[in-house]
Amino acid sequence: MSISPQEVKKLRDATGAGFGDCKKALSVAGGDFELAKKKLKEMGIVSADKRSGRDAKEGRVFSYVNTERVGLLLIACETDFVAMNSDFVAFGNSLIKQLVESGRDILDEHQELEIKNLAATIKENIYVSKVYISNIASNELVKNYLHGDHSKIGVFVKFKIDDVLKMQDEKLNNFAMDLALHVAAFSPLYLSVNDICLNYIKEQEEIFMRQMESSGKPENVVKGIISGKLKKHLGEIALLEQGFVKDDKLTVKEKIEEVSKLILSKIEVVEFKYLSVG
């Protein structure tokens, strides 16, 4: 039977076993997820590598962008020393380039084997923790950024540009890079307040209500305080509502509008991604 890459990825995430081993186990199990997990244990795959049980709390973020896609990759390891190792860094840079150029966010058998070989050479638990690949349209501009020599934070920001002739505008590109730096510094969780789920907003409102229970203030005053706290909190986690890193008198949304007027073309942030070690 045919086993999809998504099924293989699910089993791989659950067990830590390699791509090829997961695919083989699923095939033997006829696609049954729980049975495939059992087969991996029977094969001794899940616990075969003693290093796989050790904590890998360090790592490095890698990024690559071409005209069609942008990608972020987080590879975990046990020590910061290994995260700076030249072989580790070269492998990560090569892998993210391969993934972006292929458009895949799942490693193939050869790439899985390369990781195993690297782990055996370096003698640490090394694995791909997160991969994110995003397509770039012809009217979109992307800026990616890796923070510091150790690259423990990696981000990209994607803009939609109404007038594609403005794509090379210096003011636009400088702002785009500044916003990538902003995302790295402030690690927003959402693009806009509208993207925040209602359940989260309700839970946060209830937290503020409990905090005000013993305040002794009139109900209408309490409601006003809670509303203000909620607005402030949501603004802190939504990119467009955050104070811009280079001019906190303006929100990111207001800065975007300002740059749009400067370059005589509407620009819009349509996506961002933030990855960090730990």
Curated annotation (Swiss-Prot):
One GO location term (cellular component): cytoplasm
InterPro entries reported in the protein's UniProt record: EF-Ts_dimer_sf (IPR036402), Transl_elong_EFTs/EF1B (IPR001816), Transl_elong_EFTs/EF1B_dimer (IPR014039), Transl_elong_Ts_CS (IPR018101), UBA-like_sf (IPR009060)
Localization annotation: Cytoplasm
Signal peptide stretch: none
PROSITE patterns per record: EF_TS_1
Keyword Protein biosynthesis: yes
Family: Belongs to the EF-Ts family.
Protein name: Elongation factor Ts
UniProt source species: Borrelia duttonii (strain Ly)
Originating gene: tsf
